[in-house]
């Protein structure tokens, strides 16, 4: 349950602090005073997504905090806290959330930073907040299934069916993609097969191209190369070492230098170097002569080299900019072809998966339908009983479950089973049951929603029920019935209710009055518990808009006494 709520700089609220008792608290105030702002602040603390518009004008941040008592909370709450090393203090935890003008926010539980989603999950174990116009959700037939499943405790079965259904849908989608791509797959396989055959036959080597280009150049310029090499040989060796050739001149110079060394020994190093140069050049001349003698022109070889290079250039243009890239393409093509070739096997496996999952879906769907039919009657009886206590004695409540047969379910089903669930109402004796949207007034819808919340609260562990204007469209004896019902409900749950009806406020254990006051350019919403004479005056205002007339005050006092007697379990008008 929630024990304390503190709000600062939220909308019109500058600063507000409230304490809540364990039973029934009513919030009242003039229209527009800001009652719903208080619940809006609580919704913000409970993880609702909001923007910086929440922040009060001229302020930089808004914050809300609350103390929750958790000694009677579900075991899942304590496990969740322990996993995050959050320790309650005296069975209580402090929740805080801040929203800054920049749009960024921060949240804590017991000074441990948490996410917005953490707040939303954690508080879902404590609070069920019925906001304004939530009764309109009764017009959404899809919500009816959720109500029934919640009452029957079927969420685990629904989740299991949903998971199986999702797996089936995914396998079917994969099969459909395979079927739609079958033609393209065959074309792609044919192309890859041709490309790989072409590349395998080519047997490219990453170093081959450069070698072939060098060989082609030599073969194409054979005559020029031979002429150049002959001239080089003539310059070095001459013809039979004729006069003027390089080697002949060096040999003469070496002989002269040897004579000079006999006169001056310091010339010996120079002679040695010249001698070394002579033999080095002689060796080069031999190498070049051997090279020249080996030059041969082969037209067939030139044709082969040019054809091979033409093939390499064509494959590079077709499959990649370089031979290395062509080889990479070949590797990718081999893998793709392998994957595409496996698609036939994948298709067979997927078809088997679809059959297996369909059998599971049918089994789970049938079991879920049986359980829904089993709990529907008990749910109908309990809701109808609450409606009778809320002044709808002639009303008959029906739970209509339309279950698709197995053949239809194979073709068309949804993630929540084979059943379409809809609540129907017969408001008067003898009238046929009709959808809520066609028969229920605003007051009837509010009471139907209250009945549903009451019945559902008996099967969940949420300790606090919060209602915003659950009394819309009712008055008189109906208001008395709703007030007494809320009071009875508060014996087992903490109930907080925003109300415009004096009858409901008078039956509450505690009464909070919300006011809006203006000072200069600023407007502020405040809230405080009213007791004694102040509570009498507030109930009188709710009755007749008059806080001073003796008649209104007397009527208010009588309502409060009746509410007190009801809380004590005493009989009387």
From Swiss-Prot:
The keyword DNA repair applies. Pfam families: SMC_N. One of its GO terms (biological process) is DNA recombination. It comes from the Bacteria. Keywords: ATP-binding, DNA damage, DNA repair, Nucleotide-binding. Disulfide bonds: none annotated. ATP binds at residues 29-36. GO terms for molecular function: ATP binding. One of its GO terms (cellular component) is bacterial nucleoid. Belongs to the RecN family. May be involved in recombinational repair of damaged DNA. This is DNA repair protein RecN. It comes from Treponema pallidum (strain Nichols). The gene is recN.
